[in-house]
């Protein structure tokens, strides 16, 4: 449905192939404009490269960039933020500024949410839903409980990125 797609630290071809195929289908069918912060290689559809710099986000949210008007004039813009962006020092700033800009321009509402996060692992979203990870600072709350002997039993289903040290 989207008529404008912006990738911020996301590479859907490698991180979410189904999403990438839907973006491609949308491009072929609707000639959707697609932008990416930085050149992320062949996505199987054309996209315009934006300088990979946090300053550009500030320019966009301050209405000092060409993309500002495109987002505002778009009926259903889609901004996809890669999970890796949220881990950098300016990650929270980037996410919050985009969220505030989109909310103030009615691009996040009951009908459409323009701001999306592309998770690195399928299990990550479920981990947030179950309260295993803190969405505020990314801490592994369950692992903290285990270290403090506050859990009797733990089932690990699809925890792709947990690292355990072997005890000798």
What is the predicted role of each segment?
Residues 1-22, 26, 35-75, 80-168:
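Extended redox/cofactor-interaction regions of prokaryotic respiratory oxidoreductases
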């Amino acid at each position: 449905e989207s008529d404008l797609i912006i990738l911020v630290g996301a590479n859907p071809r490698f991180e979410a192939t189904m999403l990438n195929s839907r973006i491609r289908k949308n491009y072929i069918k609707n000639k959707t404009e697609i932008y990416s912060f930085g050149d992320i290689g062949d996505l199987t559809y054309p996209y315009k490269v934006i300088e990979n710099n946090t300053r550009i986000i500030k320019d966009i949210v301050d209405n000092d960039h060409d993309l500002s008007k495109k987002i505002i004039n778009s009926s259903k813009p889609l901004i996809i933020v890669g999970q890796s962006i949220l881990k950098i020092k300016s990650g929270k700033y980037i996410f919050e500024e985009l969220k505030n800009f989109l909310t103030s321009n009615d691009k996040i509402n009951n009908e459409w949410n323009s701001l999306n996060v592309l998770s690195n692992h399928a299990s990550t979203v479920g981990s947030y839903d179950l309260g295993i990870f803190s969405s505020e600072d990314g801490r592994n709350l369950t692992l903290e409980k285990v270290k403090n002997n506050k859990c009797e039993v733990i089932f690990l289903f699809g925890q792709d990125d947990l690292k355990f040290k072997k005890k000798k």
